[in-house]
Amino acid sequence: MRIALGIEYDGSGYFGWQRQAEVDSVQGQLERALSIVANEPIGLFCAGRTDAGVHATGQVVHFDTNAIRNEGAWTLGVNANLPDNIAVRWVKEVDDSFHARFSATARRYRYVIYNHSFRPGILRHGVSHYHGNIDADKMHQAAQVLLGEQDFTSFRAVQCQSKTPFRNVHCVNVTRQGMYVIVDIAANAFLHHMVRNIVGSLLEIGLGNQPLTWMGDLLALKDRNQAAATAKPHGLYLVDVTYPEQYQLPKLALGPLFMLD
C-alpha cells in the first residue's frame, strides 16, 4: 500500500529535511513516528528537500507499508508521536504510480520578509528581517524577467547537484502586506538555493542598490559570483506542490497562517 501525506513544519530547529546521522532532521522525525504507527520500518520520499531553517506548509511525502490503517488513524497516530513543530495535515492512499517527487509538476514557495526598523520577537524564526526601505513594486517588476524556461546558473548554489541549470518559472509575484514583503514563486522545480538566491538579488533592487534591469543581466552572465548574497533561510516556506488531477490530492490553504491567502 502506498500512502501520501501533506506535511507542515517549522524548520528552524532542524538541519533540513534530509535524514542525517547524529543531527535532527524533519525526515528522521517523520520516519520515526510513522514506524511506530505502522509497527514496521518506514522510509519516506518527499516532493522537495528543504534546507536547514526552511519551513513548509505544503510538503508532500509518500511511503509504502504493509500496515492497514484508516486515514484518521494515520493522522492522529503520527501527530501524537511527532514533536510540536511538525504536523500531518492530510493523509490519502494513492496508487503505486504516484511518487512525491517525480509525479510533481510544480512547486511553489513563499519568502516572507519583515520590513521594519526593529527585529521581530514572536516571529523571529518565521520571517527574515530586513530594516531598509524596500520597494516591493520594483522587486515585482524586476522579477518578471525570470519567467519561462531559462538557465538559472547565476542563482544556483555552488554545491548544487542538478545535471542541468534550466528551470521553468511559471509565475513570480512580489507584494506588500503592511510590514511584510512576500515573494511568491512557482516553477516546475528549483535548483539548490535558487529561491533564496533570487530573493537576495531582488532585495538589492528593492533597496535601490541595483537597477531594474539587473535580474536580466544576471541571467545573461550565468555566474553565481555576480549575484547577491543568499537570503536568510528563516523566511522561506514550501507552500504547495502540484500533481496531476488523477491523484486527487487534498487542496488546503497555502499559508503561512499569518499571511493573507
From Swiss-Prot:
Any GO BP annotation: tRNA pseudouridine synthesis
Catalytic activity as recorded in UniProt: uridine(38/39/40) in tRNA = pseudouridine(38/39/40) in tRNA
Active site (UniProt): 51
EC top class, as a word: isomerase
EC number: 5.4.99.12
Domain of life: Bacteria
Keyword field: Isomerase, tRNA processing
Gene Ontology molecular functions: RNA binding; tRNA pseudouridine(38-40) synthase activity
Disulfide bonds: none
Physiological role: Formation of pseudouridine at positions 38, 39 and 40 in the anticodon stem and loop of transfer RNAs.
Assembly description: Homodimer.
Family, as annotated: Belongs to the tRNA pseudouridine synthase TruA family.
Protein name: tRNA pseudouridine synthase A
Native organism: Shewanella putrefaciens (strain CN-32 / ATCC BAA-453)
Highest classification ranks of the organism: Bacteria, Pseudomonadati, Pseudomonadota, Gammaproteobacteria, Alteromonadales
Gene, per the UniProt record: truA
